[in-house]
Amino acid sequence: MTRTVPGPTDRVVVVGAGLAGLSAALHLLGAGRRVTVVEREELPGGRAGRMDLAGYRIDTGPTVLTMPDLADEAFAAVGTSLYERVELIPLHPAYRACFADGSSLDVHSGAEAMAAEVERFAGAAEAAGYRRLRDWLQRLYRAQMRRFIDADFDSPLGLLHPDLARLAALGGFGRLDARIGRFLSDERLRRVFTFQALYAGVPPARALAAYAVIAYMDTVAGVYFPRGGMHALPRAMAEAAAAAGADLRYGQPVTRLERSGGRVTAVVTDAGRIPCDAVVLTPDLPVAYRLLGRRPHRPLGLRHSPSAVVLHAGTDRTWPHLAHHTISFGAAWHTTFDELTRAGSLMSDPSLLVTRPTATDPGLAPPGRHLHYILAPCPNTDIGPGPAAWSDLGPRYRDTLLRELERRGLDGIEAAIEEECLVTPADWHARGHAAGTPFSAAHTFAQTGPFRPRNLVRGTENAVLAGCGTTPGVGVPTVLLSGKLAAARVTGVPGRRGSRPRSSPAAAGSARQSGDPALTGSGAAPRARGESAHRLAPAHQPPASSPDFPAAARQSPPPGSPPAGPTAPATEGRTG
């Protein structure tokens, strides 16, 4: 039995209307609590916000949605459904991977489509290895989900469960890169199933194999896009919460918490005082701890994940060979991780995520125009350039990235940009994110599960944390779970799983939208590294089938200014 908030918990204030806060609010409402949600911005979403710029509707946060049933659980808590409120479009391919040798691969979640694509790309032996890998990923997910991901921890003793032995038997405590190498010998394919470790802030060669569960979410469970953009998800969650009786108060920053002994008795905003029996705090950890007036002691300080530079570009043209999500891998893969996590330097041969949301939803841009989001991982401000350095470095790095994209086949991209938004670690820092990163604490072994900052804070009886900095961690699915787990700490009632029939996401094309009205080359041997064939080229089309990082954006103001538009408390990555 895990610990819960003692005493009365009828009135709950949730601080932050991001994905974590809205998930917590819906689960609390479903358990009969009276819920007030306070949000500093003028609309819901947190990092999964929206910026309107000259007719471009820009998602300021996560671009990848996986495992939508976890979001549906929150809707189900108040008797409604995600699939009734948001049209989810399955992405085929989920990603397109482009490599420095000129080859490309479409990544599909369907087993047969992906096996056929792997065989085209790397031969029958690798396709057989992919099938074995897929089976292993499914078993790994089943061993982890209920006990180690969708679970609260009060101590490391919570790990002692038969599923721990199952996880060990599956090789979950080995190294990720080595374990994937048991199934796939092609280095390019191994990258497709290990790059997700960057979400966890650990290079694949050092990450636990258990983190392959993130690859399961991306490559097996499927990737979706809400019509109207990712912001359609938190908007629908906020509407469902309001319909269930929540009091949502926007544009009200929290200034302090009132306490009596070990309990928080009220949340104070610049608009007034809100009495409470319990509070759920979803801001980034430094902000939450500052409000609480206490910081838990850790033998070692938290180690943070890499950050990201994101350029959001509204253009007068596109490059049709770009998929919705295209990963452009540099040749210097292992060097990249050393630069990001050890040397603290910008990538010398960058691996980039290019997202083209208008490939799926043209209504996100003016007629005849297109949106492209370019995400470049970079060091956080603890080990890399500090916030002040980015005032000059940001614009120069933006130019470097555009030149590199031109070299990789996006001819004329700089000239095509009509409107743009840029975010750097300085902006994350200005919004209160530790180490200037939206990806929070890295998922090292010492910062995972019961070793991650817990959602109950010692010395405070009735405050619970949610968001990417606490359990389970970074990413849209896990941030949604963090809200559910926080609600369970208040109510003592675990969120219900599978409590009612759900519509299939694949059938979501007929679902009604609520709220916002708008709401892979041949299998030839690779060329030598450094050869000039690295282009974002179209992939060979595979048979018909049946990459979160979180991003943020601002219209480029004077360097060092805080970002415009909605932002945090959490990803996706993959945060919320």
Q: Where does each model-flagged region fall?
A:
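Short beta-strand to alpha-helix junction loop
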Residues: 165-176, 218-239, 389-397
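Mid-domain catalytic core of redox enzymes
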Residues: 255-366, 507
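Rossmann-like flavin
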Residues: 100-208
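N-terminal glycine-rich phosphate/pyrophosphate-binding loop and immediately adjacent elements
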Residues: 6-143
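Extreme N-terminal leader/targeting segments of oxidoreductases
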Residues: 1-12, 31, 444-451, 498-530, ...
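A glycine-rich dinucleotide-binding beta-alpha-beta segment and adjacent secondary-structure elements
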Residues: 186-200, 347-353, 411-472
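Helical element adjacent to the flavin cofactor pocket in flavoenzyme catalytic cores
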Residues: 213-264
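C-terminal segments that line or cap access tunnels to active or ligand-binding sites in enzymes
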Residues: 316-429
